[in-house]
Amino acid sequence: MNEVEVDHKIYQMPPRDGFSVAHFITVADVERSARFYEKIFGGRILTLGNNEGAPGFIQIANTWLIVYFGGGPTADKPTVTLSVPADPDRVSSFMNIRVADIHACYELWRSRGAEFITEPKKKYGETRCYIRDPDGYIIEVGQTDPGITYG
C-alpha cells in the first residue's frame, strides 16, 4: 500500500448500532459505475447490483457509495423521480474526497483513467480539483493547507 491508497478497515454496512452515512447516486449503468469507483479510488464492491432493481454498494475509504439506475415515484417517495444529471455542467451537490497528498492522488487516479476537469488549483485554504464520473457527476478532490484543522 502506498501513501495514496486506503487501508480498508472494517466498517459495518448496515451499521450494527448508531448510524452511518452513505452517498447515493443515480446512474445509467450500475455495473459500469461500480467498476469505475473500484478502479479509480480502490473501492471495494460489496454488492455489484444490476440494472434490473438491485443497487450496487461500494466501500470507499470510510464510507459507502450506493449506485442505482433510478426510476419513478414509489410508495415511500410518491413525488420523486431519480435520474442521471441532464446537464453535467449544472450540479446541486457532489461528493468531496479529502486527501493527504493531492498531487500523488491526481497522478495515480489519472493513470487509472480518471477524467479531471483541471489539474489541482489552490483556492480558499486548500488545493483542489474535480473528476467526472461516467454519468457526469463531479467529485471534488481536496487537500487542506498545512496548519489548518477541523474539529
Regions found by a protein language model. Give the residues of each.
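Short, solvent-exposed loop/helix junctions and linker helices
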Residues: 27, 96-99
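Vicinal oxygen chelate
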Residues: 1-22, 44-97, 104-132, 144-151
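Short phosphate-engaging motifs
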Residues: 32-33, 101, 105
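Conserved beta-strand-loop-alpha-helix junction that forms the acyl-donor binding cleft
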Residues: 27-30, 51
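Short glycine-/small-residue motifs
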Residues: 140-141
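Conserved active-site tyrosine of GNAT-family acetyltransferases
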Residues: 33-38, 109, 136
